[in-house]
Amino acid sequence: MNIYAVGGAIRDELLGVPVQDRDYVVVGATPEQMTAQGFRPVGKDFPVFLHPQTQEEYALARTERKTAAGYHGFQFHYAPDVTLDEDLARRDLTINAMAREVSPEGTLVGPVIDPFDGQADLRARVFRHVSDAFVEDPVRILRIARFAARFADFTVADETLALMRRMVDAGEVDALVPERVWQEIARGLMEAKPSRMFAVLRDCGALARILPEVDALWGVPQRADYHPEVDTGVHVMMVVDYAAKQGYSLAVRFAALTHDLGKGTTPADVLPRHVGHESRSVELLKPLCERLRVPNECRDLALVVAREHGNLHRVMEMGAAALVRLFERSDALRKPARFAELLQACESDARGRLGLDAQPYPQAERLRVALAAARSVDAGAIARGIGSDTEKIKEAVHRARIQAVAQALAIGE
């Protein structure tokens, strides 16, 4: 029995970046031998075991064969005579198909085992497929795109990009389950440069299949006086990258990605103006979230951002009553933390423009002051002074909030 550390841990060690997780492959063992040594079986489709002390995953060396379309259409073969090279050959990219032996004490020993020249591709900053079996798993398209968001200076090898396009043309991407698509998109959004993920997905044609609403934004012009970058797709990528650079949450980054979907359906005869794009964005966003089964917290923030971002940009011109109505529409009084994320998304929108990434956004501080004033109103005390007439209570609380905001900002109602 020989144990090897494989995949991403070896890649990251060679790149000099922190190793998050280690995957292990066991060559020359049977499931019975593993359990006899205290390993606990957890694999459903193929033998994977948890180490009795570290709880890390150890998989028996295996090969795989495509038997049906989609992510789950594989048949696995594992046996003591499956070699390490055979196991590495089934992996997606050369940079993920390297290994090092693990000593009985758990330390890495010996040289890097690199049958597919992954080290050369690491030095060249290239994503290259291990074999033509790459085409058998459509998730690999999403994984390469996600890796591009993490390793932003890498490029996809021409021959690998050609295979990805073949897979898209063959409909393989259409067979992916929504949960897996969302999982990979979400992970890519949380990387340092999410725009690289979408660039790779566009290059191979996959973005038009999994997120056609986003794909439609490229080539749509905006007013150059507001958007020096002009192209809507370019703008949205700048917004997402700004949100990533600030370390904002997944919900904020998803809202940044989807806030301008309605610009993709603006009638050609009114371009480059986009009057009413906010409401069109909301209508496109709802089925998108349902289709990909987007988590509620991401969906809910994205809907508020899509609907209200234009209003937030204009708050310097608003009176107190308009500000309170904005707070009520966005549920800011009950959900101030979500409103803070709304501000982050809108600030990203304002700064995700060519040459304007350091532009002041005084709207954010104005809204923070106004919301604090509105929330300082004691609705309970007002209700006790009025009695049981709920409509009167509601109107009195509303008026008190307007007055509090007007006083805090020294503006008219």
From Swiss-Prot:
One of its GO terms (biological process) is tRNA 3'-terminal CCA addition. Its EC number is 2.7.7.72, 3.1.3.-, 3.1.4.-. ATP binds at residues 8, 11, 91, 143, 146. One of its GO terms (molecular function) is CCA tRNA nucleotidyltransferase activity. Mg(2+) binds at residues 21, 23. CTP binds at residues 8, 11, 91, 143, 146. CDD domains: NT_ClassII-CCAase. It catalyses: a tRNA precursor + 2 CTP + ATP = a tRNA with a 3' CCA end + 3 diphosphate; a tRNA with a 3' CCA end + 2 CTP + ATP = a tRNA with a 3' CCACCA end + 3 diphosphate. Its cofactor is Mg(2+); Ni(2+). Residues 232-333 form the HD domain. Keywords: ATP-binding, Hydrolase, Magnesium, Metal-binding, Multifunctional enzyme, Nickel, Nucleotide-binding, Nucleotidyltransferase, RNA repair, RNA-binding, Transferase, tRNA processing. It holds the Pfam family HD. Magnesium is required for nucleotidyltransferase activity. Nickel for phosphatase activity. InterPro entries: CCA_bact (IPR012006), HD_domain (IPR006674), NT_sf (IPR043519), PolA_pol_head_dom (IPR002646), PolyA_RNA-bd (IPR032828), tRNA_CCA-adding_enzyme (IPR050124). Belongs to the tRNA nucleotidyltransferase/poly(A) polymerase family. Bacterial CCA-adding enzyme type 1 subfamily. Catalyzes the addition and repair of the essential 3'-terminal CCA sequence in tRNAs without using a nucleic acid template. Adds these three nucleotides in the order of C, C, and A to the tRNA nucleotide-73, using CTP and ATP as substrates and producing inorganic pyrophosphate. tRNA 3'-terminal CCA addition is required both for tRNA processing and repair. Also involved in tRNA surveillance by mediating tandem CCA addition to generate a CCACCA at the 3' terminus of unstable tRNAs. While stable tRNAs receive only 3'-terminal CCA, unstable tRNAs are marked with CCACCA and rapidly degraded. A single active site specifically recognizes both ATP and CTP and is responsible for their addition. Monomer. Can also form homodimers and oligomers. PANTHER family: MULTIFUNCTIONAL CCA PROTEIN. Comprises two domains: an N-terminal domain containing the nucleotidyltransferase activity and a C-terminal HD domain associated with both phosphodiesterase and phosphatase activities. This is Multifunctional CCA protein. It comes from Burkholderia cenocepacia (strain ATCC BAA-245 / DSM 16553 / LMG 16656 / NCTC 13227 / J2315 / CF5610) (Burkholderia cepacia (strain J2315)). The lineage of its organism: Bacteria, Pseudomonadati, Pseudomonadota, Betaproteobacteria, Burkholderiales. The gene is cca.
